[in-house]
Amino acid sequence: MPLESGKLINDLRVSELKTELEKRGLSTQGVKVVLTVRLNKALRDEGLDPADHVFEHAVSPMKKSTRRSNEMARAAAAAAAEKVEKGAGDEGNDENVLVEEKEEEEEEEDSHDLQIIEDHELEVPSDEKDDTLVEDEEFEEAEQVEPEPEAVEPVVEEKPEEKLEEKPEEKLEEKPEEKPVEPEVVTVEEPVAEVIEVEKAVAEPVELKEKPEKEPEVVLVEEPVEQLENEPEVVPMEVEEAKKSDEQDGEDEFEEDDSSSDIEIIEPTLQESEPLAEEKVEKKEKKPEEIPHNLEQNEPISMETEEKVEEEVIILNSSINNVSQDDEIVLDYEEDLLEDPLDEPIEQKEPKAAEPTPKQLQKVEASTPQATPSKAASSSAGSGKSMLFGDDVKKTSIWIRGMTPATKASSVKQLASQYGKVIQSKIFNSKAADANGDVKNCFALIQFADVTAMELAMTSLHQKNYQGRVLRVEKVSESHLTSSAEKLAREKHVAEAASTMSTSPAPTPTPEPVVTTTTTTSAAPKRKEPIHAPESSSSEGQRAKRRAIEAPVRSRSRSRGGGGEPRSSRKPITFDREEESNRDSRRTIAAAPPARTSRMARSPLRAPLRAARGSESSRSSTRGGGGGGESLTISSRVDTSGCRGGAIKRSVERSVPNNISTSELRRKHHQIHVTVQQDAPRASYQTEQYARERSSSTTTSSRRRQVSPDRSEQRRHRDEPPPRRAPQEQPSRRRGASPPEPPRRQEGARRSEEPERRRLFDEREQLAHIMAAKDMYAEQQKIRAEKALIAFQMQQLEKKKLEAELQIAQKALLMQQAALGGGGALVVDGGALVAGGGAVGYHHQEHRSSYGGGGSSSNGGSSNRRRQTRRSPSPPQQHHSSSRRQRRDSGGAGRYRQSTSSSNSNRNSNSGGRNLVVTATTTNNTNATNAGRSYGIQSVPDASSYSTNNYQQRSSAASAYDLQITATMPQAGAANSGAAYHQPYGNVYQHNTAAYPVWGGLDAQGHMAMDTNWSQNAATPSTSTSSGGGGGQQWQQQSYGSNQHQHHQNNNSSQPSSSNRRGNDYGNYRGNY
């Protein structure tokens, strides 16, 4: 190639810029501007001038190489589009071109490199000119190149419309053309770089939109084609094998037909429409992404086929002619199970529909509990393996005991689904039947998806009440029912395989699996041999005896004679098997004995005999169906093993119907009596609670066996064990009970230590009653103490209330004394204040004569009488002569007579004793103690009955009198600090009262002071008195005035003295002293 003279940095192309950057070990990513800046910086670091530096590069024929590279790229893209079977459109560039375009666009957003442009001096106008020149050249060349993809496009677009009709020969012809083309695209580097510059303006906006679709197609061209060509049948065969094994495992609970199909079940539509060769060709042409999609499309078809197979499955006949066992066999040790035909199959449809991939199919295969051997796999499968439980299945499966025989697998599945995902639910019935031949118990086998759901179901369902029964849950790995179920499944599969080989024709390669199943199903009712569960070694002897005993039939002579009168001579009994249906119509009367006796210990000698009678009665009850369901079954025992007629074991009395022996009847009669009265007569100390617990389960009996540690310790130190009462002594201790029964042989009789356990149980109950009584007595004592405390608090409150009333009365008395001190006498009568002395007393006397009605109690009212009933009447008034003399000296004779007469008339008119005459006087000592004495007080009425409202409403005269009183009240209230309350009455307070007996009042506890001097010469104040601001009052009186009178008493109050009812009565009986 000729060398170019030289170029400046602005004249370099993108490829040349990248070459220069590669030489210097710098990054080549980014657009031309970024590359130029990066190279400019590198030149400056080397000490060169980027503007003057000249670069030398080889000149390459751009146009020819560009066209040739475009042709090669378009040819490679067309070939790739034909392989992938998709139209490529206008995309004609190579993969490397798209990768470089993408790198250039990503680097346009590089902000770090763009910031460098500001730091360097670039001639942007010269770059723009060069770019426009290059773009013009590229646009001209692109116009010349454009017609070429138009010729290729129709060929590419027609490929998807042919609908995969190519033959594999065409693929083989096209493949050699690809291999020489693709290495040319990879090896040629410079033309590819030039294509970017040529088609930058035209192809860039188109390829940017289609690039996300273009890139995955080019990447997937080679590898998927090689997989499909090199391994055309690997993936479909894996799916087919997984599906086959899943179908075999999915139907393991039933006796279904074992014929399976390989390819036909998965893709039945392809079989009908196209030959097998074309199907293999299409498998080669499929992409790996479409394989799961095809499985999802074909999945419902295979599921429908399996549903048909399950509908026509051979179901094991559950009504096997088995001989019923004894009703009283403990079910905890039951090992013989029968599978219920109404089991629910494994949940294999939902995992198939939701998880169609081969790995998930393998997981479902591993989780299935059984494996039904097919015709091809039955010979290869090991017979030693367990057909029902695997190690993984045992970890997630549980047994549920105690379900009713009518339980269905769907209901069990619904019950267990609330705790987690249920994979399988099966129902097993026990072979033990009752007297009517019905199944006694039902066992459910449930397999969960994980161990967490199984543990949650165990904790939730154990001891749960379901359909009237208590469920018991066990793990499959720990239950003995697992071995019985495995034996049953193994026996069933072996018998089913043998019957299938004998009844069905040889296997043919016909593709109709449903038809083969139908032929197997049609042969199911023709099988006469019952399939028995494997017998345990312990019950072989019982089964041998049970088969030997057969039910006797009615004799011909008895049916001919119609059961006539009994004959005197015995004759051999003959039987006719033709009339077997009419045999025991009168004999079968009742059902099984009560459930309580089923847990008792059984005698080993009588168990086979009872089993024989139970089986015989069950057969006779199913044939005859006579009687009711609440009485006892009575049957005779006939041994027909040796001869046709047989012999009756017991002695026969002809008077008894149906030749029932009397000894058997007597023994049955005792059992009937036992059912009515289950327990023997008990002693008097035994309670009814023991009878209830005695009839319950074994948990109560174990609780009764527990003895308290204290009693056990006491018993160890005793020399002799506690005496035991014999069972014969018990009836004698119970009075009024029914006569005792004769000693009888009954199974499950009480052990000898039963009375001792009863005594211990009752002693514990008595101790509990005593402790409860003690607790109740303690509670009652506590309640009594609380009541006493409440009563005491009420008395205290009442006491405080009386104290407050007395304090208010004291204040009122003080105000009355200050207002009426001139007269020296104060009469309080029914709410009316009467004062002696001057015109006031006269006016009031006039008022009393005019309104009192001549001694009538007009001012009392009904309220005074109501108050009279509440308190005891006050004693009659007693005035000492000294007090009368004091009144005469202080107030004058005339005024004294008026006030006394008015008070006497009021006292006589009001018979209720509600008049209170207060003769008050105070003294002002020189030492300023101001301890005013009050005496002559009668009773202490309530303030409510002496309100002045009634007094104010009587007349205008009464109101005028109140005004006279209230006119003096402010003056009295203003003079509450010194000697006299009012100046006009100052002489009264200066009067000497030392000669009169004075009572100091009650102390703080409501009692009379011990230091009170009752002599006339010594009137020392009591230690309990207290002096207030305006003179301490030792007697506290009820408030008789209105709120006006009480308003001025605030500063004269002394501390209240405590008083109770007895202290309050001192005012009644000691008021005159």
From Swiss-Prot:
Expressed in most tissues including the hypodermal, muscle, neuronal, vulval and intestinal tissues. Isoform a: Expressed in the pharynx, nerve ring, intestine, neurons and ventral nerve cord. Residues 9-43 form the SAP domain. Residues 59-186, 207-305, 337-388, 481-759, 845-917, 1015-1073 are annotated as: Disordered. GO terms for biological process: digestion; regulation of mRNA processing; regulation of transcription by RNA polymerase II. It comes from the Eukaryota. Disruption phenotype: Viable, but have an extended lifespan. There is a decrease in early progeny production, resulting in smaller self-fertile brood size, and an increase in late progeny production, which results in an extended self-fertile reproductive lifespan. Defective pharyngeal grinder positioning, which results in feeding defects. Animals also have protruding male spicules. It holds the Pfam family SAP. One of its GO terms (molecular function) is RNA binding. Residues 396-478 form the RRM domain. InterPro entries: Nucleotide-bd_a/b_plait_sf, RBD_domain_sf, RRM_dom, SAF_Modulators, SAP_dom, SAP_dom_sf. Residues 366-386, 496-505, 513-524, 588-622, 901-917, 1015-1026, 1034-1060 have a biased composition (Low complexity). Residues 91-111, 128-151, 223-232, 248-265 have a biased composition (Acidic residues). Keywords: Digestion, Nucleus, RNA-binding. One of its GO terms (cellular component) is nucleus. Residues 112-127, 156-182, 207-217, 277-293, 573-587, 707-727, 742-759 have a biased composition (Basic and acidic residues). Residues 674-689 have a biased composition (Polar residues). Involved in pharyngeal muscle development and ensures pharyngeal grinder function during feeding. Plays a role in the defense against the accumulation of ingested live pathogenic bacteria in the intestine. Has a role in the determination of life span. This is Pharyngeal muscle protein 2.
